[in-house]
A protein has these predicted regions:
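Residue patterns forming the tRNA-binding/recognition surfaces of aminoacyl-tRNA synthetases
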Residues: 2-13, 17-20, 26, 30-34, ...
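N-terminal catalytic cores of NTP/NDP-binding nucleotidyl/phosphoryl-transfer enzymes
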Residues: 42-104, 155, 164, 235-243, ...
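Acidic, turn-prone loop/beta-hairpin segments
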Residues: 95, 184, 188, 194-202, ...
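Residues immediately within or flanking Cys/His clusters that coordinate Zn2+
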Residues: 184, 402, 473, 516, ...
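Short cysteine-rich clusters marking metal-coordination/redox-active sites
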Residues: 187, 405, 476, 519-522, ...
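Cys/His-coordinated zinc-binding microdomains
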Residues: 191, 464, 480, 523, ...
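Protease-associated
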Residues: 248, 255-330, 339, 343
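Alpha-helical recognition segments enriched in aromatics with Gly/Pro capping
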Residues: 308, 348-360, 465-467, 486-639
Length: 939
């Protein structure tokens, strides 16, 4: 008789090899064809909502690992919240306006911007953006992200643009919108403003100069020893041509500055830079007369060295960006020619001088000496003039990375031009208070955005481009007065509802304005339109109003925003500002931020370095579930590492989790809910109640409850790496290495319908059910595969994603039982080490070939005695004997109260279960079997 065929061996069609790249598309098709997202929403209609508002990715390229991380984090949260009973509508979005798309469209399509009328260019951009929306949508869906993919929000949609106009109008009517000056990147060769996306950096040789600025107001800080001598602040600049626009000198408030005697004069500069400046300028700067903290010089004054500027004052201001990395610690400040200079200028209400025209030539405002010179050609003349005036302390040429126009490859400049702004001062206090009402995850995000909003200056919201939502302002042809009010905003918004923002270029001002509109200043009836468009951050910053507040399935304010940590400066802030300005509160109740994706060494990914990993390649090799597992395994609060080795390790973790589940499926193969076969395990009638289970099975279910507690807490606090480690440990250590290994004999060798086997099967089924729900938000494809393989009641949900969250069964938790088994597991690991040593020494083959004598005393003795009846089974040996006290020749363990002797098992080996026993041979009908196995095969 072939006794192997009488064993209850595991049997399942659930494949050992996942084959995720090939199988996952089948589940995408299943979810889509069966409208699982729609059915989920219908099932939870009327439940409390949890709205996670999607930060719109930019529609101009393939998704990268940062996109994948972000979308999967959102998906994990939404799937968990659904299982907890929430109504979880998820509307994905896209950002589709702005310069990157405009330039990408021009470049890809080979267009000449100057030869296209605005509407033609806009239509090209429109089509280009939607093409990338489709590509990205498919990539996001491939990651297993569930949402309303057929009805996303897109910033170029008519309804979105109309609502954006209304947000702008509300802010304007409250007095928060005004026109002023702002420095922008400017290409003198292309004669156009540029965005950061339109610049690239290249090496350039630049003359740097150390300039003596006569100090005329010292705040009483000049040391006694320096009084009576001519004093100068020494500034440093890499752009000598901007000297005509100098209106301030910036110091770091915390730096120590020195008053130094040099050649009969007193020079003021950072103490830590004296040696460096002295070496470059060939000056002895060792005679320090005194020191002053930067903050004590705030509002002191210098005078511009050029006499033709009529003693124009240069204010001493404070700026944290001033460092001792280079220069003098006294920074030349020209708000008309620098972004940080401009911000400093706004803070101190400095004049914004910009004596440069659109072609990069210095104007009359720079003085007759420099008028008409191209900016970079003026560097040497400025340097020579300063030398003539005895105001040049020194100079040197340096090579550094400098911004160039991506189009013409020439160096660019900063240039102040007229722009539209949102005034933050009008609602700054409200915004800061609103920040305190939001939950920030991690908590440091609160202080970060608080500092940014507290320190930020007015928001420049205009761009000199065509592809975007226009600034809805009209100008009177007669007097130049600008016109924007509730009536004009309503009219423009209504046009946009019908035709989109193309209407601004397709219709005249008179057509767009309400009939009978006249200039409130002069009564004029003819108008022209503003040519600037809005900053794309105003687009996405209006999305909470245009989407969450408008779509009936959503709600406002939303429960959560979730994006990368760079969005404290970006979308989190633009959304906060528009929301507070319009509605008086933050648009979100919580904000979660994650770090950047970097390589395995913590370096930024770069094509030139060759360390770029893209989601598409990972999916082809491993499948999307491995990316999802990587997302959950990462502590996203810091930068998140990824590398081929990390992915390989995660694939191994995935394999272990999958094998644990497969083992349970295989050993519950006779399980069913509705069956007439008496040999099958009918869960309704054959499940063993908890209090009747074998104690080891009770232990397993108790640990399942503890796992549920830990995993639920981790989901609630968004600490997904905690639940990853908890489930991984549960599957590999508590289940595979301990519980499932021990019950193998019970499952295989006991009669199929024995209580011992049914007890284990009941426990395993409950473990499997809870595991697939806990893992479904992370391993969405694999858990769907498991669910489809499982035998279920007729009324079971068609998708694993519809299952409710498993409740913790507190009655299963017994501290005494937990302590008992935790203590035994610790002792068992010591015994297992000795058995492994015996195996390596060829003393035994399999552990069932062994008899162990356990020489124990004290605590170890008590623990072993508590499980003495099942000790051999628990150790997976044929015999286990407890001997009180120590023994000569026994193998020492990591415990002083336990030694182990391993010997060959006594008796004969049962052909069916492989356990050695004196009972083998006692049954004449089955002489090679032990008593238990003989009884099992007779039935």
């Amino acid at each position: 008789m072939d006794y192997g065929k009488t064993l209850n061996l595991p049997e399942t069609e659930f494949p050992m090899r996942a084959g995720l790249p090939q199988r996952e598309p089948d589940f995408l098709k299943f979810w889509e064809e069966n409208d699982i997202y729609g059915k989920k929403q219908a099932l939870h209609a009327g439940h409390k909502k949890f709205v996670l508002h999607d930060g719109p990715p930019y529609a101009n390229g393939k998704i990268h690992m940062g996109h994948a991380l972000n979308k999967i984090l959102k998906d994990i949260i939404m799937k968990y919240k659904y299982a907890r009973g929430f109504d979880t509508p998820y509307v994905p979005g896209w950002d589709t306006h702005g310069m990157p798309i405009e330039h990408a469209a021009i470049k890809e399509l080979g267009l000449n911007r100057n030869e296209l009328d605005p509407l033609t260019l806009r239509r090209k951009c429109h089509d280009f953006a939607l093409q990338w929306v489709d590509i990205q949508r498919n990539d996001f869906k491939r990651l297993g992200v569930l949402g309303d993919w057929e009805n996303p929000y897109i910033t170029l949609h008519h309804s979105f643009e109309a609502e954006q106009i209304r947000v702008f109008g509300t802010m304007a009517n409250k007095g928060y919108i005004y026109k002023g000056k702002k420095t922008v990147y400017w290409c003198p060769h292309c004669e156009t403003a540029l965005a950061e996306a339109e610049i690239e950096y290249g090496e350039q040789k630049t003359p740097t100069i150390f300039v003596k600025m006569p100090l005329v107001k010292d705040n009483g800080q000049t040391p006694e020893a320096a009084k009576g001598k001519k004093a100068y602040m020494v500034i440093w600049t890499t752009t000598p041509w901007t000297m005509p626009a100098n209106v301030a000198v910036a110091l770091n408030p915390a730096l120590e500055y020195a008053w130094v005697e040099c050649e009969g004069e007193v020079l003021f500069m950072a103490k830590d830079l004296l040696a460096q400046v002295g070496a470059v300028c060939h000056k002895d700067l060792s005679n320090i007369l005194g020191t002053t903290l930067g903050k004590d010089m705030e509002f002191a004054e210098c005078v511009h060295p050029f006499p033709e500027y009529n003693n124009r004052r240069s204010l001493v201001v404070m700026a944290d960006y001033v460092t001792t990395e280079a220069g003098t610690g006294c920074v030349h400040t020209a708000p008309g020619h620098g972004d940080v200079d401009f911000e400093t200028g706004l803070k101190y209400k400095l004049p914004i001088l910009c004596p440069v025209d659109s072609q990069g030539k210095l104007t009359e405002e720079a003085g007759e000496r420099f008028k008409g010179m191209f900016v970079f050609d003026a560097n040497i003349p400025v340097l020579k003039y300063l030398a003539e005036l005895n105001c040049l302390l020194g100079k040197e040429n340096i090579k550094h990375q400098y911004a160039h126009c991506w189009r013409c490859k020439n160096p660019i400049i900063f240039r102040a031009t007229s722009q539209w702004f949102a005034s933050i001062d009008g609602f700054r206090d409200e915004a800061l208070k609103s920040i305190d009402d939001v939950q920030w995850i991690p908590s440091w995000g609160q202080q970060r955005i608080h500092n940014m909003v507290s320190d930020r200056h007015d928001w420049c919201i205009s761009r000199q481009r065509v592809w975007g939502v226009p600034i809805p302002v009209f100008y009177c042809d007669n007097c130049g007065e600008h016109l924007i009010n509730e009536a004009t905003i309503d009219s423009v918004a209504n046009w946009f509802e019908k035709e989109g923002s193309d209407a601004w270029w397709a219709h005249t001002a008179e057509e767009l304005l309400p009939e009978g509109t006249v200039c409130p200043k002069c009564g004029g009836k003819h108008f022209h339109k503003e040519s600037d468009i809005m900053d794309v951050w105003f687009d996405s910053g209006s999305s909470h109003m245009a989407v969450a507040a408008k779509r009936p399935e959503l709600s406002w304010p939303v429960a959560m925003y979730l994006e990368g940590s760079d969005q404290h400066r970006g979308w989190f802030q633009s959304s906060l500002l528009t929301s507070v300005a319009v509605a008086g509160r933050a648009p979100y109740e919580s904000v979660l931020t994650h770090g950047y994706v970097v390589d395995g060494d913590g370096r930024k990914m770069s094509k030139s370095v060759g360390n770029v990993i893209v989601p598409q390649d990972v999916i082809k090799q491993y499948g999307a579930d491995i990316i999802r597992l990587w997302t959950a395994s990462s502590d996203y609060k810091a930068d998140i590492r990824i590398s081929p080795n990390i992915l390989k390790q995660l694939a191994e973790v995935y394999r272990k989790i999958r094998n644990t589940i497969r083992y349970i499926l295989g050993n519950t193969n006779d399980f069913n809910y509705e069956t007439d076969n008496t040999n099958d395990f009918n869960y309704e009638t054959d499940a063993v109640p908890f209090n009747e289970m074998l104690e080891l099975d009770q232990w397993a279910l108790m640990h399942l409850q503890l796992l549920k507690k830990e995993v639920t807490a981790a989901y609630e606090s968004y600490d997904f790496h905690v639940l990853y480690h908890a489930i991984h440990n549960f599957c590999t250590v508590e289940m595979s290495s301990f519980y499932l290994d021990i019950i193998k004999d019970r499952l295989y060798a006991y009669k199929a319908d024995s209580k011992e086997r049914r007890s284990a099967q009941t426990a395993m089924h409950e473990i499997l059910m809870d595991l697939i729900v806990m893992l479904s938000p992370v391993l969405s494809f694999t858990m769907e595969e498991v669910w489809q393989f499982m035998k279920k009641p007729a009324n079971a949900p068609e998708s694993v994603q519809m299952l409710p969250w498993p409740e913790v069964k507190e009655e299963y938790i017994n501290e005494e039982l937990e302590t008992k088994w935790d203590n035994f597991i610790e002792i068992r690991s010591e015994i297992t080490k000795v058995l492994e040593l015996a195996r390596r020494n060829k003393q035994i083959g399999h552990s069932l070939d062994a008899k162990v004598e356990l020489h124990a005393e004290g605590e170890a003795l008590a623990i072993l005695k508590s499980v003495e009846k099942d000790l051999a089974t628990l150790l997976i040996v044929s015999q286990a004997v407890i001997v009180e006290g120590a023994a000569e020749g026994a193998e020492a363990t990591g415990r002083e109260d336990l030694k182990v002797t391993v010997a060959a098992a006594e008796g004969h080996k049962c052909e069916r279960c492989w356990i050695y026993s004196d009972e083998v041979g006692q049954d004449a009908e089955h002489p090679t079997l032990c008593k238990r196995c003989a009884e099992a095969v007779k039935d």
